[in-house]
């Protein structure tokens, strides 16, 4: 159990069956079958679409992987110490310090830049997927600019040119919900902030689930490395929304076609595709606040509470497992049923 006021680390191993861990385990065979089916089709035609869309790290670089491991840093839930006066956004210096501490603890590096070097190479093209759907009205519940900025700055400090760094979202109002380039919250010169609008995709169609064709957006496919930044929220369709769904339904051209049956197994299959898995490098969860009910939109402020955490992982399933348990613990304390 995480204790407020201290810096803590939690590790989860892949055998757990809670939440998204069990979800992906249950659908892993289907994901493999999907990939094998595409490979068989490619062999029959002499083409290799998966190989063409799969990327590899720069020569000689091996990004750090720690399956099942999640590191959380917390400084408690004192709003005065953590948050700006509106209690919606973290204090910039607090967000920066907590992120660096989480990165250092996760990697064992001596500072935040050295930690980022474990995941990003100067020759990478970097896409940073943020989440702002809950912040489109009043900037209330989105990945905070105060956390996005130090991530971008660390990537630049590694040596990646700014023109090779893109912060992206699905829609313009989702992107503005993060306050990127809003009200003076500027990204470093040359770094792009873009939205794809479910239309900007350059790859061929792929069929991932039940023959439904889709494309991943160009900001993801043109990158060699993806940093995934999301939140801790419940979701009225799929139960929990965090890192996995941020990439899947936030990076394809037809997310509306992949929500049936509570988006199960679509989330797992879309995420487990080599297009995604070959690019994932780092997952950061903005846990300064969370929504435990009536999500994913921030429609009821009474369902949004201070949580005071920053999480780092290379395993989106492990982190979503942790996030789901965090929400279930809150719901149990409030006499509500589990998300499961």
Task: Report residues per predicted region.
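N-terminal and secondary-structure boundary signal
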Residues: 2-340
């Amino acid at each position: 159990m995480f204790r407020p006021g201290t810096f803590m680390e939690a590790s989860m191993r892949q055998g757990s069956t809670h939440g998204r861990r069990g979800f992906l385990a249950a659908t892993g065979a289907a994901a493999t079958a999907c990939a094998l089916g595409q490979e068989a089709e490619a062999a029959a035609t002499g083409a290799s679409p998966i190989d063409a869309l799969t990327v590899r790290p720069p020569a000689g670089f091996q990004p750090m992987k720690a399956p099942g491991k999640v590191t959380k840093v917390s400084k408690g839930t004192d709003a005065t110490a953590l948050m700006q006066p509106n209690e919606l956004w973290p204090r910039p210096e607090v967000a920066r310090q907590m992120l660096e501490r989480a990165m250092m603890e996760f990697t064992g590096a001596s500072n935040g830049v050295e930690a980022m070097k474990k995941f990003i190479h100067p020759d990478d093209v970097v896409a940073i997927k943020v989440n702002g759907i809950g912040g489109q009205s009043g900037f209330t519940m989105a990945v905070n600019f105060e956390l996005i900025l130090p991530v971008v700055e660390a990537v630049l400090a590694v040596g990646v040119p700014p023109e090779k760094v893109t912060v992206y979202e699905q829609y313009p109002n989702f992107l503005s919900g993060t306050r990127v380039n809003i009200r003076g919250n500027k990204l470093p010169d040359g770094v792009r902030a873009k939205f794809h609008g479910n239309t900007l995709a350059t790859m061929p169609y792929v069929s991932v689930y039940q023959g439904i064709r889709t494309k991943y957006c160009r900001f993801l496919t043109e990158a060699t490395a993806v940093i995934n930044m999301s939140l801790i929220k419940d979701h009225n369709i799929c139960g929990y929304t965090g890192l996995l769904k941020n990439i899947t339904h936030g990076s394809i051209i037809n997310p509306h076609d992949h929500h049936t049956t509570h988006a199960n197994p679509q989330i797992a299959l879309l995420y487990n595709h080599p297009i995604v898995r070959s690019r994932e490098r780092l997952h950061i969860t903005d846990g300064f606040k969370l929504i435990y009910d009536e999500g994913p939109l921030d429609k009821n402020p009474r369902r949004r509470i201070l949580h005071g955490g920053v999480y780092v992982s290379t395993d989106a399933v492990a982190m979503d497992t942790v996030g789901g348990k965090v929400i279930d613990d809150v719901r149990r304390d409030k006499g509500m049923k589990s998300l499961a």
